[in-house]
Amino acid sequence: MGPPKKSRKDRSGGDKFGKKRRAEDEAFTQLVDDNDSLDATESEGIPGAASKNAETNDEQINTDEYGAKDYRSQMQLRPDHGNRPLWVAPNGHVFLESFSPVYKHAHDFLIAISEPVCRPEHIHEYKLTAYSLYAAVSVGLQTHDIVEYLKRLSKTSIPEGILEFIRLCTLSYGKVKLVLKHNKYFIESPHPEVLQKLLKDPVIQKCRLIRSEGEDFIQGTLDGKAITQFGTKLPPGATDKPTPDPAAAAGADGTTAVPEDITDFYEKIDKEEEDEDEANLKTVSFEVAQEKIEVIQKRCIEIEHPLLAEYDFRNDTNNPDINIDLKPAAVLRPYQEKSLRKMFGNGRARSGVIVLPCGAGKSLVGVTACCTVRKRALVLCNSGVSVEQWKQQFKMWSTADDSMICRFTSEAKDKPMGCGILVTTYSMITHTQKRSWEAEQTMRWLQEQEWGIMVLDEVHTIPAKMFRRVLTIVQSHCKLGLTATLLREDDKIADLNFLIGPKLYEANWLELQKKGYIARVQCAEVWCPMSPEFYREYLTTKTSKKMLLYVMNPSKFRSCQFLIKYHEQRGDKTIVFSDNVFALKHYAIKMNKPFIYGPTSQNERIQILQNFKFNSKVNTIFVSKVADTSFDLPEANVLIQISSHGGSRRQEAQRLGRILRAKKGAIAEEYNAFFYTLVSQDTMEMSYSRKRQRFLVNQGYSYKVITHLKGMDTDSDLMYGTQEEQGQLLQLVLSASDLDCEDEKLPGEPGYRPSGSGGAVRRVGGLSSMSGGDDAIYYEHRKKNIGSVHPLFKKFRG
């Protein structure tokens, strides 16, 4: 085999940024490798209440032979249980009937106080956690409101252990806020006794800033009105309040089906929130020294009173406003408005995370947040492609132009002076190696700025230590994290709750699909039988070639080719994903399709993506895991997965998101997008596939199993149909190197080796390899013409 040939384009254009990229990649990898070793400092920023778990309450519960728990002794059924929508189990799990007349109210309430576990069509499951209750308090819900409304919604009595758990987790959360007001930092609370308790602590006493002798608490009111409208104004006479649902007040027979105590109390909570938003809340506060902010935050967490960060951006006169507004064409959908109301509920900007499905308009939410704050904005992305896409999103939805938006990547460094929005990547900010002079100047300017808002795209990918490094480099008043999948296969996702802020809002995928905001997707798992020769080798080999054998299965290749051909005839746009680069190249080259993977240059990526979007002759592209996140391809409506990263639930959801964008002008069918996973039968790939599907199944999606593709056997145009062709493919797979058998490693992943790094590589080859005959190329080295030389120098060189 030997190393692949290097094209003239790679040799000429690739060297320009090669050293710079390698240095950045090594720095990125080092940061993430450091994150794997968790030390004591990792848990310093987490309150003790966050470690509490409601599931410990049911350790003594009796179970039957099938493992079902008997909760009858703790949950007494109420007489009117048929009119109430949910059960609250002693282990903190909550079950909601989605067909209940008060489903909408109960759903909004549960999203605020709990984490969704599983949301199929009829019964939804949620889970009360310490973090979810922390998030509930942060958006204004009080302990007694949570307890009282749960009691009114529940079909049974609430177990005492759950009530105690809620009180423990919400007792001290949300009582104290850190506010930047008139360019000064204040610790603010509506509860004077809480501030008195804080000031008894010697560490916080030293951080207090006293302007005059005998100064007591500063009295004040929360005088900022809630921002309830974003984007396009409503027509005269219209209201932005949701209209009451007649079905919520009446049953099928026209009689009142909903107990009055539910609707009355919900209206009471709404009224209380409105009153708070109308700025009549009395507060007390004291000023603290700016240089002591980090010390105060850490100490408040230790004494179980974590500070909620809020930015009073309308009273910030130190940082100039930037001239940016939403365009009239930017109309927000209801769920986008709801998520932003959670962020700007009391006229200030709360830091936190918003979770929306891929294709549901996360970028527009980020752009709207920046237009609302109207201060300098910093947007952090995963890749250079997403930097370009964010720039286009700002130009599409807002009045920002090229002069206001600055890109800062290894290949595009715009001049930052005078710009109001900087878009860059995480690796550019956290890079520790030597930079170019131009990059050094931009970094110095970036660090000197006081950013009003920092938007973190795909926030779930940020390891804790790496994000902490971003926080130490960048000064920002408000942090907004955006993601579609707030989950990781490790437990580090919980760190985001206190590094950024609580989860502010999470949308329901199936509801958005029913309303047409995202595509209606048919998910299918295609079973591909292993050919006898491939399966024999699969059973006998004990090396990493097992994975390559089931990915390169001839039956899988033929299924992929058949599906591509079928959907191209329909006029569909298809993306084929493969984590394994050896398979990616082989499939793409054999089918004569363009492909994108790690080493593909930025310009080539953009060219391929533009052709895919606008060229009717390019209907299929092959991509590696580089396209898992931040690739905006609204035209794609078919996705075929031939190789994946083990049992990663997050990757499955992110890939589905590539085709989730609502389809304009689609044929009126039951489904307008298709997601295929090709799986080799009787291999470990089937086990991985089951694990990967868990998250999407919990969102309400179902997978159709296809064991036979009708018409594939009679199609003579498909490759690898004969035993001879399959034998040649098997020899190609067996002669592949160990490196070819591995999945692609991207910067930031364990085991990533930057291109050009040293180290021995094991390869399989013939005798010609030993003589250096593999992939030999002729190359001329020409000396640069240095022009005329002075006679004096000629004399010395002679």
Curated annotation (Swiss-Prot):
Positions bound to ATP: 360-367
Region (Disordered): 1-62, 235-254, 746-765
GO BP terms, alphabetized: nucleotide-excision repair; response to UV; RNA polymerase II promoter clearance; transcription by RNA polymerase II; transcription initiation at RNA polymerase II promoter; transcription open complex formation at RNA polymerase II promoter
GO molecular function per UniProt: 3'-5' DNA helicase activity; ATP binding; ATP hydrolysis activity; DNA binding; helicase activity
Family listed: Belongs to the helicase family. RAD25/XPB subfamily.
Keyword terms of this UniProt record: ATP-binding, DNA damage, DNA repair, DNA-binding, Helicase, Hydrolase, Isomerase, Nucleotide-binding, Nucleus
Cited function: ATP-dependent 3'-5' DNA helicase/translocase; binds dsDNA rather than ssDNA, unzipping it in a translocase rather than classical helicase activity. Component of the general transcription and DNA repair factor IIH (TFIIH) core complex. When complexed to CDK-activating kinase (CAK), involved in RNA transcription by RNA polymerase II. The ATPase activity of XPB/ERCC3, but not its helicase activity, is required for DNA opening; it may wrap around the damaged DNA wedging it open, causing localized melting and twisting that allows XPD/ERCC2 helicase to anchor.
Domain Helicase C-terminal as annotated: residue spans: 558-713
Full protein name: General transcription and DNA repair factor IIH helicase/translocase subunit XPB
Record-linked SUPFAM superfamilies: P-loop containing nucleoside triphosphate hydrolases
Subcellular location: Nucleus
Pfam family for this entry, one: ERCC3_RAD25_C
Catalyzed reactions: Couples ATP hydrolysis with the unwinding of duplex DNA by translocating in the 3'-5' direction; ATP + H2O = ADP + phosphate + H(+)
E.C. numbers: 5.6.2.4
Motif (Nuclear localization signal): 6-22
Domain Helicase ATP-binding, chain residue ranges per copy: 343-504
Gene Ontology CC: nucleotide-excision repair factor 3 complex; nucleus; transcription factor TFIIH holo complex; transcription preinitiation complex
Compositionally biased region (Acidic residues): 33-42
Motif (DEVH box): 457-460
Compositional bias of kind Basic and acidic residues: 10-25
Record-linked InterPro entries: ATP-dep_DNA_Helicase (IPR050615), ERCC3_RAD25_C (IPR032438), Helicase/UvrB_N (IPR006935), Helicase_ATP-bd (IPR014001), Helicase_C-like (IPR001650), P-loop_NTPase (IPR027417), XPB/Ssl2 (IPR001161), XPB/Ssl2_N (IPR032830)
Quaternary state and interactors: Component of the 7-subunit TFIIH core complex composed of haywire/XPB/ERCC3, XPD/ERCC2, GTF2H1, GTF2H2, GTF2H3, GTF2H4 and GTF2H5, which is active in NER. The core complex associates with the 3-subunit CDK-activating kinase (CAK) module composed of CCNH/cyclin H, CDK7 and MNAT1 to form the 10-subunit holoenzyme (holo-TFIIH) active in transcription. Interacts with PUF60. Interacts with ATF7IP. Interacts with Epstein-Barr virus EBNA2.
